[in-house]
Amino acid sequence: MAGHSKWANIKHKKAAADAKRGKIWTRLIKEIQVAARLGGGDANSNPRLRLAVDKAADANMPKDNVKRAIDRGVGGADGANYEEIRYEGYGISGAAIIVDTLTDNRTRTVAEVRHAFSKFGGNMGTDGSVAFMFDHVGQFLFAPGTSEDALMEAALEAGADDVSTNDDGSIEVLCDWQAFSAVKDALEAAGFKAELAEVTMKPQNEVEFTGDDAAKMQKLLDALENLDDVQEVYTNAVIVEE
């Protein structure tokens, strides 16, 4: 763990998410529709839908909105036929970036993603150019002060692969992405509620950015995040606030 605070980064991420709740709801509705279309409308037998519905609950989305999105997906209604496309590229100093999109117009989407990269000092790469630098995992982060021994016992029993304590005292639990919901349920049943719980592309190594480079990198990430077709942006860049 480097010198930056993982806990501070997570709190900043949550605050930013709260500020963009309307956009988050729009993304979740698209994800719910696609998950229901591909795997059916029963969250108990559709892990992808279960994950999306859980995210919607965490984002305080009304249940009626969730149900309508599921119904549209299962029924194949207009608007549910999105295509999943992943773009990969580089930011400042070669930092790795993955951009996951859901789109009904890939020509529009690739043009917008490429423009964001080029405008803010990055460039798009080819398929597979940076994805190998990330692991597809379930990630949980618990607040400093959480009992490490008790959490480790519960996590490993639940099927987690790794438990580690960061320099700032927060505790990170990692699991196979396909086991995410089962591990989450088991940890909550044991009394452990994560401050962050998500399936993510976790970088194998991180690169810290400070000063002007940090500001430039943040502008690129924000530009990508703000595109309507973008669902998730992953990077190995860590913006250090000074």
From Swiss-Prot:
UniProt record, GO biological process: regulation of DNA-templated transcription
Q: Which InterPro entries match?
A: Integrase-like_N, TACO1_YebC-like_2nd/3rd_dom, TACO1_YebC_N, Transcrip_reg_TACO1-like, Transcrip_reg_TACO1-like_dom3, YebC-like
Q: What is its main location?
A: cytoplasm
Domain of life, per UniProt, equals: Bacteria
Please provide, alphabetically and separated by semicolons, the GO molecular function terms listed in this UniProt record.
Answer: DNA binding
**What is one Pfam family matched by this protein?**
TACO1_YebC_N
The entry's keywords: Cytoplasm, DNA-binding, Transcription, Transcription regulation
Q: Where in the cell is it found?
A: Cytoplasm
* Entry annotated with the keyword Transcription regulation: yes
HAMAP family hit by this protein: Transcrip_reg_TACO1
Q: Which family does it belong to?
A: Belongs to the TACO1 family.
Name listed for the protein in its UniProt record: Probable transcriptional regulatory protein BamMC406_2210
Q: Which organism is it from?
A: Burkholderia ambifaria (strain MC40-6)
